């Protein structure tokens, strides 16, 4: 099994790259955002945890993610404590995901985790791919999700710089180009990786 980790700022195109790995190389994708979304929606222990830390973010047992995001943006000590618990749960689910697909002899696994580097989720990766694009395109993508420019800038400031990400990366994919070009970049990486794996 080869494990890829995707690192990139908000709106850089990580999910787009992950979808290409899934479609063209049958990779299994661990989508941390989806995992957390499901925890907030269905996990009673997590919903209870949210209500303990941020009572105004839960109404009748339903987590208001927009409200919860505002607590993240304030960057207070409560959020740091809360986030550490959520990260521990996600880490366990990531390990279970990898073990499951290893038993099934899956060839490729891709970790699509926003804080891959910052939260040390990358230690199990064989290769790290830095996904990048222009700041303008990042902002356009984020605004389409319903976030404001202020929220985009605030989140972006809390994330690692592009230069810091590059230090961890084995490869870089630029997503501000055509879909055909993005696929070409991925195919080039896969050729490189498969050649390396065959040599080892």
Swiss-Prot record:
Name the UniProt record assigns to this protein: Dephospho-CoA kinase
Subcellular location(s) per record: Cytoplasm
HAMAP family: Dephospho_CoA_kinase
One Pfam family named in its UniProt record: CoaE
Residue stretches making up the DPCK domain: 3-200
Gene that specifies this protein: coaE
Pathway annotation: Cofactor biosynthesis; coenzyme A biosynthesis; CoA from (R)-pantothenate: step 5/5
The protein's Enzyme Commission number: 2.7.1.24
Cellular component aspect of the GO annotation: cytoplasm
Keyword Repeat appears in the UniProt entry: no
Record keywords: ATP-binding, Coenzyme A biosynthesis, Cytoplasm, Kinase, Nucleotide-binding, Transferase
InterPro entries cross-referenced by the UniProt entry: Depp_CoAkinase (IPR001977), P-loop_NTPase (IPR027417)
Listed GO biological process terms: coenzyme A biosynthetic process
Catalysed conversion reaction: 3'-dephospho-CoA + ATP = ADP + CoA + H(+)
Family recorded in the similarity comment: Belongs to the CoaE family.
Residues that, per the record, bind ATP: 11-16
Native source species: Ehrlichia canis (strain Jake)
Domain of life: Bacteria
PANTHER family assigned to the protein according to its UniProt record, in alphabetical order: BIFUNCTIONAL COENZYME A SYNTHASE-RELATED, DEPHOSPHO-COA KINASE-RELATED
GO MF entries: ATP binding; dephospho-CoA kinase activity
Functional note: Catalyzes the phosphorylation of the 3'-hydroxyl group of dephosphocoenzyme A to form coenzyme A.
């Amino acid at each position: 099994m080869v494990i890829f980790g995707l690192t990139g700022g908000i709106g850089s195109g990580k999910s787009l790259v992950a979808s290409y790995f899934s479609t063209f190389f049958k990779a299994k994708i661990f989508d941390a955002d989806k995992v957390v979304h499901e925890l907030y929606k269905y996990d009673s222990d997590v919903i209870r945890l949210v209500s303990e830390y941020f009572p105004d973010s839960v109404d009748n047992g339903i987590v208001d993610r927009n409200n919860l995001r505002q607590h993240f943006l304030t960057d207070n000590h409560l959020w740091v404590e809360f986030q550490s618990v959520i990260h521990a749960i996600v880490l366990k689910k990531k390990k279970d995901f990898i073990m499951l697909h290893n038993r099934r002899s899956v060839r490729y696994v891709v970790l699509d985790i926003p804080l891959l580097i910052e939260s040390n989720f990358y230690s199990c990766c064989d290769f790290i791919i830095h996904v990048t694009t222009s700041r303008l395109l990042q902002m356009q993508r984020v605004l389409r999700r319903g976030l404001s420019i202020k929220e985009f800038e605030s989140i972006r400031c809390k994330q690692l710089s592009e230069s810091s990400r590059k230090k961890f990366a084995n490869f870089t994919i630029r997503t501000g180009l055509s879909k055909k070009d993005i696929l070409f970049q991925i195919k080039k990486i896969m050729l490189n990786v498969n050649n390396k794996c065959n040599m080892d």
